[in-house]
Amino acid sequence: MHGCSAGACACAASRPAVPVCTIGHSNRTIDDFIGLLRQNGITCLLDIRTVPKSRHNPQFGQDQLAKSLAGAGIEYRYLRGLGGLRRPRKDSQNAGWRNTSFRGYADYMQSEEFAANVDAVIELAASRTCALMCAEAVPWRCHRSLVADALLVRGIPVDDIIDARQRRPHKLTSFAHVEGLSITYPPGPQAG
């Protein structure tokens, strides 16, 4: 079993004092991206892409990104265990997601592997100002919004960095069903 159970996290004593952020690299220049991280006080970037490279934006390939961030004094960590591109299970409890990628990721969220990786984010964020990064510019089109939901139910505040003018608190997905630390997305009138 992972460190969190019965609504309380074993790492509660080391909860982050500041929100964990989410950000998408999109097609930004590396200078603009680093500027956005600095503007938001990010000291550690957590890469949650399944494939940590970009054909169209090579500045966000894992090696080049890590080098650029190191030059700016920002730590880089790759968290493969939070990567997207998951397939839905036939017996999915997450049929509220019409998007099969989100449904597959929501199914993965029920696993011990996912829980352990979320616990790792919480541990890292206890001593660093972290941002979860994927490729999509906006969080509502990216699996990082589901990771943010998982952090919220563990009592960890999350802010979504949209651009230089917008940083806003993440809100739990409207059709999420929460039981303790478990989140499902059942079908219903508000389903996505």
Task: Cite the ranges covered by each PLM segment.
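Residues lining hydrophobic/aromatic ligand-binding pockets adjacent to catalytic sites
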Residues: 1-192
